C-alpha cells in the first residue's frame, strides 16, 4: 500500500504541473486516477483530481495483472467517484466483453492494443467470438465479417475474403 500511496502523490503533483504547463492551450487534458486496488486511495486520488479543471479522467493502474473481478470492482468504484459530466476513460482494456463490463460500470472511453494485435494476426472480433480470417475456408467467402452486426463496416464494406 505504501508504494501505491507514493505513486498517487507523485501523480497528484504531476497533475498540477501539467495544468500549469498547458496554459491557455485548447488541448484537452485528462487526469489519471490512481490507487491500485485500494478503494480509499482511489477516493483520495479522485477527490483531489476532480477539484482541478481537467477535461476528463482516466482510470489508471488497472489491466496490469490483477484478477478480472478485482479490475471490474475497482473500475466500478473509481468510475462512481468521477463526475458524470466529463469523460471517464479506462486505460489498457480492450476485449469486447471487457468493454461492455466497463461501460456497465460507468466508463465512456477506452484504448488498448488488443484489437490491433488481434487484427495483425488475421483475426477479428465478432458477435460470435474470434474469427480466424486466414483460414483457407474464408479465401473466397462473400459472407459478411459478422452477419449479426449492423454497423456500416459489417453491412457494406467487408466480406471475409477482403478483410485480410
Question: For each of these PLM feature ranges, what is it?
Answer:
Residues 1-24, 136-139:
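Non-catalytic, usually N-terminal nucleic-acid engagement modules in DNA/RNA processing proteins
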Residues 21-30, 34-145:
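Glycine-rich phosphate/ribose-binding loops and adjacent secondary-structure elements
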Residues 148:
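Residues immediately within or flanking Cys/His clusters that coordinate Zn2+
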Residues 151-154:
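Short cysteine clusters
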Residues 157:
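Cys/His-rich metal-chelating microdomains
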Residues 161-164:
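Conserved small/polar residues in nucleotide/adenosyl-binding loops
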